[in-house]
Structure formats: structure tokens, C-alpha cells
Design a protein with these regions (language model features):
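FAD-dinucleotide binding site
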Residues: 1-412
């Protein structure tokens, strides 16, 4: 154990925690990063398949790349940034979505977001599903899209919160993996892995942080664990922090799981094309064919569909994917695909989901969650971001903001 007494402890080694700890390290502020997993990165996790390809099981896109601080980190690390337009910016495969129908869907999509923008200006909040046109044939697909974007269906999501998300529509990727990027950025900071934080006592002159490897005394702490972990009270606070728990309950984690599938005779397809299994139901996956030009498919499952499949593991996801793919591409297509890997984020004990959304009426919980307690207990993470929630750069920005608050509180 590096130290049982340190000035600042950062709890959680995801994007927010790594960014905060690195800021302290660079400012020569004594800090210890404590992470429950045997690795850094949190919900940014890259694995390597048998062909040597880096696969992002968690976040994979440098969203709003023209203002995303992880881009500069990637450049400094010498990582390869792929600026190929994302598949959702292109027209889907004709076999799954004829051109005329896709144009009609895009119109419905744009009209929905126009209604969202108008409704968000009103004082009252409501579920985003109230903005669906009851006569539209595209409501199921709009809902399916919501499960990829937010990890949840529109009936569960605050329209005000959804409208507050800011995107520049510039989306890049890191060939070596987003998870690789995040974990490497924290490699030089003092840290403890495989160490859960069970309780934080902030009632005394100094903080007492109870971990699976013993107690740590500290002056200040930044808590960066996912909102679902706080809501489940996996970390006990003394004195209790009921406002934080209530805020976290209003910011549940949606679910978005990715299944990677190997593809034979991939040259038949263009690079980075997309198809939907179905365009007339919510429980459908989105399929990104040949990402980076690789002979594989990234299959995206979200919301209740992903939750229903998780108990069955990789086999359930693959069976679902094959049934949809053969429906679009023919029965022989089943012979060309094999599962590579999937990670079930909802079943992950240190995440309990993928990324946060606000439930109707709870959009302002992000600010409540982000507020420090007595100038000693600080909070960060994508769920604390008003405009960049659900992203690794949202995690970074809140982590840096919390670190700067700590530095200011200690007088430089």
C-alpha cells in the first residue's frame, strides 16, 4: 500500500479519476488514486483480439472531437486518430434501409429533435417520449436509437436533460483504443488497484477512507465512481449524504453493450457502413460493419433489449445478432460470422451500467451531484456534467474541475 496518509484521495480510476489524479500529479499535490478494478480506465476498456485488433468494450468514440481534451492526450501519446466519418453520418446499407425510407426517417428524426428543443424551453419537464408523433411510423426506431445514444428508451429520459447534451457532431476514434488512451494517461500517478472503497467518514478533522486494503487518512477526497454505484450505496458516507444519494438515483445508468463479431469475406462491404436488424421495433441492434476497415462487425445493443440479453451472456447476444443479420442478408450469412467478445456492463459490479441519463423531473440532479461537501468531499464523473454527460470527455472535464477546486481550496 503506497500510503495510509495522503493529502488527496481520488476514488475511481475512470476518465474523471485519471484526469483529476494526473492534474494533481502535474501540480505536485500529494495524491493517491484508488481503483476497485485490477486496471485503470473504468468504463473505458480496450482488449486485444487474436488478430491483434484493439477492441473498445466501453466508450469508443472521441465525441465532439474538435473540443475533446482526450484528442490532445492521444496526440501526445502518439496514438493513431481515425477521422473516418461515423456510420450514423452515412446512409445505412440499402438492403436494411432503402434510400427513400431512410430519407423519411431522417425527416422524422429531425422533427423530433426540433420538438425537443422547443419543449425544453418550457418550465416543466416530462419524458422525452411525450414528444413522439403518435402518427409516425418511425417511433420504434427513434426509440431504438435512443437506446444506443442514451442507453435507455425515451419514456425513461428527461427531455430537459436530453436537450442539454452538447455535440459538435465531430466524432473520431483511436485505433489503439480509447481505453488504452485513458489507462496510459494515469500510468504515472500513485495508485492502488484491486482496492474497493467501502466508506468515507468526513465527520472528523481529517477524512477516514475505509478500503479493502485498510484505512487511509486524507484532507480531501474526489469521488468519481458511476452514479449507479452511489445510488446503490456501495460507498457509505458518515455523516450520511442523502442529497447525493437522491441525486444519483435520479441519474441512473443506461445500458449499451457491444458485441464484436468476426466476418468472413468482409471485402463485400464498404468500410464503416451500418445496418439495422429491424426498423419497425425497439428491440433491435445497430450493426457497424468493417470499423477501421477490419473484417468484423460491431453490434450495438441498448436499453431493455440489452438488459434482457445480459443474463444469457455472449451466446444470447450472438444468437440475437445472427437472427437479425440473416433476416437482412440471407441465411448463408450465418456461416460467415463468429462471436469475438462482449462485456455486460449492467452486470459489471463496479459500473452497474454504461452511462447516465436523467429521469423526468431530475435533470438538475447533475448539478446537485457535482456540488462539493464542506470543501472536503468532491464529486466528478460523466454524470456530474450538465452538457457532456455519457462521455469520457465529460468525465475528464468534471475531474479537472474538481481537481481545480481542491487546488484552490488548499491555496494553490
Amino acid at each position: 500500500m503506497p500510503s495510509s496518509d495522503v493529502e488527496v484521495v481520488v476514488v475511481g480510476g475512470g476518465a474523471a479519476g485519471v484526469a483529476a489524479a494526473r492534474r494533481f500529479h502535474d501540480a505536485s499535490v500529494p495524491c493517491l488514486l484508488v481503483e476497485a478494478r485490477p486496471r485503470l480506465g473504468g468504463r473505458a476498456w480496450t482488449v486485444t483480439d487474436q488478430s491483434g485488433f484493439a477492441l473498445d468494450l466501453g466508450c469508443g468514440w472521441l465525441h465532439s472531437a474538435d473540443r475533446n481534451p482526450w484528442v490532445a492526450v492521444a496526440q501526445a501519446q502518439g496514438a493513431t486518430i481515425d477521422k473516418t466519418p461515423p456510420p450514423w453520418m452515412n446512409r445505412p446499407l440499402e438492403a436494411s434501409f432503402p434510400r427513400s425510407e431512410h430519407a423519411d426517417f431522417r425527416k422524422a428524426f429531425d422533427e423530433f429533435y426540433a420538438r425537443l428543443d422547443e419543449a425544453a424551453r418550457r418550465e416543466t419537464d416530462a419524458a422525452a417520449s411525450t414528444l413522439l408523433d403518435p402518427k409516425s411510423r418511425w417511433n420504434a426506431l427513434l426509440n431504438a436509437m435512443s437506446t444506443y445514444i442514451s442507453g435507455a428508451e425515451l419514456d425513461r429520459i428527461s427531455l430537459k436533460d436530453l436537450d442539454r447534451y452538447h455535440s459538435t457532431d465531430v466524432n473520431w476514434r483511436v485505433v489503439e483504443g480509447y481505453g488504452t488512451l485513458v489507462s496510459a494517461y494515469g500510468a504515472d500517478v500513485p495508485l492502488m488497484l484491486d482496492c474497493t472503497v467501502d466508506a468515507i467518514d468526513h465527520g472528523g478533522k481529517r477524512l477516514k477512507i475505509e478500503t479493502s486494503k485498510g484505512a487511509i487518512a486524507a484532507d480531501r477526497v474526489i469521488v468519481t465512481v458511476p452514479s449507479a454505484i452511489l445510488a446503490a450505496e456501495r460507498i457509505r458516507f458518515g455523516p450520511a449524504l442523502p442529497k447525493k444519494i437522491q441525486a444519483a438515483l435520479g441519474l441512473p445508468l443506461g445500458l449499451a453493450d457491444k458485441l464484436f463479431i468476426s466476418l468472413q469475406n468482409a471485402e463485400e462491404f464498404e468500410t464503416s457502413v451500418r445496418l439495422f436488424g429491424h426498423t419497425d421495433r425497439v428491440a433491435t441492434a445497430g450493426y457497424h460493419i468493417k470499423p477501421f476497415g477490419r473484417p468484423m462487425i460491431e453490434a450495438y445493443f441498448g436499453g431493455r433489449c440489452a438488459a434482457d440479453l445480459e443474463p444469457g451472456g455472449e451466446a444470447a447476444f450472438f444468437d440475437f445478432a445472427v437472427s437479425e443479420l440473416v433476416g437482412v442478408l440471407g441465411s448463408d450469412f450465418a456461416k460467415r460470422v463468429k462471436p469475438i467478445c462482449v462485456h455486460c456492463w449492467g452486470s459489471d459490479p463496479f459500473a452497474l451500467g454504461s452511462y447516465s441519463f436523467a429521469t423526468p423531473g431530475f435533470a438538475d440532479c447533475r448539478q446537485t451531484l457535482a456540488e462539493p461537501v464542506d470543501g472536503r468531499v468532491f464529486f466528478a464523473g460523466e454524470a456530474c456534467s450538465r452538457h457532456d454527460f455519457s462521455t469520457a470527455h465529460g468525465g475528464w472535464l468534471t475531474g479537472i474541475a474538481a481537481a481545480e477546486q481542491v487546488i484552490a481550496a488548499r491555496g494553490g
